Every structure is written in C-alpha cells, then in structure tokens.
Swiss-Prot record:
Coiled coil: none annotated. One of its GO terms (molecular function) is argininosuccinate synthase activity. Its EC number is 6.3.4.5. It catalyses: L-citrulline + L-aspartate + ATP = 2-(N(omega)-L-arginino)succinate + AMP + diphosphate + H(+). This is Argininosuccinate synthase. Pathway: Amino-acid biosynthesis; L-arginine biosynthesis; L-arginine from L-ornithine and carbamoyl phosphate: step 2/3. Belongs to the argininosuccinate synthase family. Type 2 subfamily. The keyword DNA repair does not apply.
Length: 445
C-alpha cells in the first residue's frame, strides 16, 4: 500500500495540522462531510501574528473535528534554534546577510511533535497544507515517517476531488459560509507569510517578481527600517554566553530560553535587525525568493560569531563554517535528525560552542547596520601584546621571523616552477596589465 493516499480515507481517523486559517478550516469541514473522522492538531510555535491560540482547537471542534489538541512546541523550537546557531547551520546568504533557516527549524519541530501527538491518539493518517511544489511537503513527509513508520499521508491539496470542489480561496470562503460558519475571508495580501517565534518568511505572489523589493513587505517582528518616517534611535546591547548558551541580555539573566529569545526579538525588532532578501534553491532545485525576519537570532548570532573568532583558531573556524554550511543544507532539506546532521551538529556543539563564554556589547542602528563596541571572554586567544610594535616582552624575536621566512623559500620556489610550466604549455599568457609575474625559463625565454 502506498504511503501517500490520493483520495480521502472515509471512515478513518485523519489528523490535520490545523492553523485555524481558511485553507485548513475548509479542508477539515470538507473531510467531515465526506465521511472521514478528522482530528485537528495545532502547534503553538509562538507565532508573532497569532494572539489567541486557545481559540483555535475550539474552532476545529466547531468545524467538525472529532478531537482537537494544542501542542506547545515553543521550548523545543528555541532549543533547536539555539542548536542551529551554535553550529552555524545557515547556508543561504547574500553579501554577508544571513537567512537563519527559521522555517526549516519550525518544520522539524512541528513535523515530529504533531505526529507524536497523533500517534498517542491512534491517528495514523496525517494531512497538512503544504503544496506539491514547495519544500514543506518533503520536510513533513520525512519527519512524520521518522516518528511513525506506519504513517500514511493524505493531503487535500493533492486530492483532485477536493481541488475540483474547493480549488481556490473564494470557493473555500463560499463553502464555509454555506455551511453556516459565516467565515469572512481575510483581505488578500501581496504576499504570503509564515512565522514562528524564531522568525518570519514572506514569499509568493508579488514577491515572486524580482522587480518587487523588500519595501512592499509589512514586517511583523520589527520595524520597516527603510522608511524615512520610522524613527530609530541607536541602542547599545550586551549579550552574554556561557558554554555556548545565551544566558543574559543587557545584564538581565534568563532562566527560560524562550523568554530570552522573546526579549532578543523585541530588542532586534526595534531596529529591523535580521531582515534579508534571498534567492535560494528549493529542495527540487528550482529557485525561489523570500524576504525573511529573525531579529532575535540575528542579535545572538552577531555576539556568538564575535566570540567564535576571538576564541578559536583559524582551522577550527574554517571547519565550523564548512560544516555549518553543509548542516544548513541538511536542515533546509528536512534532514535535521538524520545521522549525518546529528554528527555535524554535535561536533560543533561539543568542540566549538562549549568554549563560547563571554560578553559582547553591540550598538544597533537601522536594519543590519551595527557596530561591535566591546568583546570580553576568559577564553580569548586574542592577545594583542603578541603583535605589539612597542618594546614589550615578545614570544618571538626578529631572528625567529628571519628563520621562518627563510623556510618559505621552499614553497616559493615550487610555486615559481609550477607557474613556469603553466606558461610553457600556454595556460598562463598574462598581458601587460596582468598582475601575474612574467615567468621566464632558465634561458630567458
């Protein structure tokens, strides 16, 4: 039997990831009318644009759910977000501005915790609102089957009968109104938004055009820093880490990581910190474009990276960055709990993050404009006296450096010989304006 069901399994329990929005509301009621036994599961991910989580399961029952549960995913979401930060699991950047993989982290948490809750209720069929062209359909597929190997997947948006009857938002709104729910369709935005406590994603519709910029977006986690009428005062912020964990902001210690990240969001959001415009490759290798927000993670990342560069040596930092980029791709692909991802993540958490103890003071201005004002750590290997040009006790002398430079003659000679070979076979033909050396053979040719 196929894992993916193309038609509604009537008479059986079907779990649906229920947001309370028009799409999942219409799908739930439609499944009920068609003979399935729908169960609704809502993840509390601390979405900044959701103000009443408790009302969502009640609406699901009203629309026909046989059962509805609200699953608090915030603690796990923040734990996975900090793990991603510790391992630098961010592979999408443009000119040094980073996307913090906030949606992939949210999917890892939602996909595992909701399916675990369904399994407790004896629900082994799962549906959600992801479309066949996106990343989430594969992410949820992988995470769901990891938790429940007996899981079957039913997605109304892959069921042709559902599509024929309720193929668009107007049809869904009319369907709900005719059912007596007086469902008022929200005003259409120029883009779609998905969010959690870690960050927000804005994409699709008008944002599919690269002629539309960030200015059409109304931020939900911070301010529109590009607007002249938005006044933003410079602000100094201190961030403290202990053994890789963020523990304090502006001298205030937080026992609860969720509360710390909420405060980091408020601080960064006042400046529009962490917003980025990215073109990326989806899992299926088609390119897409998104506008992202992550004010809190961006603030923590600035401080964390500063301490990484001050504490670890060059080879460790290089390995951390290479592994982080690879891990970021695995996270994006829905492989956050795969063995290769766990290996990369735990390596960074053990050998990089564990040494990260210290405090960084940052001045935030507008958007991603900031300055680092001070860096303190008992683990710093940055020792300016080693390189001071003043008369100080030194770890090495001028004579030591002469010897070190003399040893470089070996590889310089090898490099010169190799360039000569390349020149002789026509691989190097520098013009007059080239910075490449004019390599000649022993005969002067």
């Amino acid at each position: 039997m196929s894992t993916i069901l193309e038609s509604l399994p009537t008479g059986q329990k079907v779990g649906i990831a229920f947001s309370g929005g028009l799409d999942t509301s219409a799908a739930l009621h439609w499944m009920k009318l068609k003979g399935a036994v729908p169960y609704a599961y809502t993840a509390n991910l601390g979405q900044p644009d959701e103000d009443d989580y408790d009302a969502i399961p009640k609406r699901a029952i009203e629309y026909g759910a046989a059962g509805a549960r609200l699953i608090d995913c915030r603690a796990q979401l923040v734990a996975e977000g900090i793990a991603a930060l510790q391992s630098g699991a961010f592979h999408i950047t443009t000119a040094g501005v980073t996307y913090f993989n906030t949606t992939p982290i949210g999917r890892a948490v939602t996909g595992t915790m909701l399916v675990a809750a369904m399994k407790e209720d004896g629900v082994n069929i799962w549906g959600d609102g992801s479309t066949y062209k996106g990343n989430d359909i594969e992410r949820f597929y992988r995470y769901g089957l990891l938790v429940n190997p007996d899981l079957k997947i039913y997605k109304p948006w892959l069921d042709q009968t559902f599509i024929d009857e309720l193929g668009g938002r107007a049809e869904m709104s009319e369907f709900m109104n005719q059912a007596g729910f007086a469902y008022k369709m929200s005003a259409e935005k120029a883009y779609s938004t998905d969010s959690n406590l870690l960050g927000a994603t804005h994409e699709a519709k008008d944002l599919e055009s690269l002629e539309s910029g960030i200015k059409i977006v109304n931020p939900i986690m911070g301010v529109a820093f590009w607007r002249d009428d938005v006044k933003i005062a410079a602000e100094e912020v201190t961030v403290r880490f202990e053994a890789g964990q963020p523990v304090a902001l502006n001298g205030v210690e937080f026992k609860d990581p969720v509360e710390l990240l909420l405060e980091a969001n408020r601080i960064g959001g006042r400046h529009g910190l962490g917003m980025s415009d990215q073109i990326e490759n989806r899992i299926i290798e088609a390119k897409s474009r998104g506008i992202y927000e992550a004010p809190g993670l961006a603030l923590l990342y600035i401080a964390y990276e500063r301490l990484v560069t001050g504490i670890h040596n060059e080879d460790t930092i290089e390995q951390y960055r290479e592994n982080g980029r690879r891990l970021g791709r695995l996270l994006y692909q829905g492989r956050w709990f795969d063995p290769q991802a766990i290996m990369l993540r735990e390596t960074a958490q053990r050998w990089v993050a564990r040494a990260i103890t210290g405090e960084v003071k940052i001045e935030l201005r507008r958007g991603n404009d900031y300055s680092i004002l001070s860096t303190k750590s008992p683990n710093l290997t940055y020792q300016p006296e080693r390189l001071s040009m003043e008369k100080v006790a030194s770890t090495f002398s001028p004579r030591d450096r002469i010897g070190q430079l003399t040893m470089r003659n070996l590889d310089i000679t090898d490099t010169r010989d190799k360039l000569r070979v390349y020149s002789q076979v026509g691989l190097l033909t520098p013009g007059e304006s080239s910075a490449l050396p004019q390599i000649k053979g022993d005969d002067g040719k």
